[in-house]
Amino acid sequence: MAKLKITQVRSKIGGNRKQHAALASLGLGRIGKSVIRDDRPEVRGQINVVAHLVTVEEVSS
């Protein structure tokens, strides 16, 4: 299964509750923090909610 490296590049200040919850469920909360998650539909949906706050790159397993 492919992996995604998700990095927060913009602040969550000014975002709505849905965006705050999506960042928290991804394990993000600070600018510059990165996490690696499986490439699953659930994770892709959370990324779509905060796409303007994060960068996503595919990494090899």
Curated annotation (Swiss-Prot):
Keyword Ribosomal protein listed: yes
Disulfide bridge partners, by residue number: none
Record lineage: Bacteria, Bacillati, Actinomycetota, Actinomycetes, Streptosporangiales
Subunit comment: Part of the 50S ribosomal subunit.
GO MF, any single term: structural constituent of ribosome
PANTHER family: LARGE RIBOSOMAL SUBUNIT PROTEIN UL30M (PTHR15892:SF2), MITOCHONDRIAL RIBOSOMAL PROTEIN L30 (PTHR15892)
Organism field: Thermobifida fusca (strain YX)
Protein name: Large ribosomal subunit protein uL30
Entry similarity comment: Belongs to the universal ribosomal protein uL30 family.
One Pfam assignment: Ribosomal_L30
Annotated keywords: Ribonucleoprotein, Ribosomal protein
GO CC terms, sorted: cytosolic large ribosomal subunit
Ranges that cross the membrane: none
UniProt GO BP: translation
Highest taxon above the source species: Bacteria
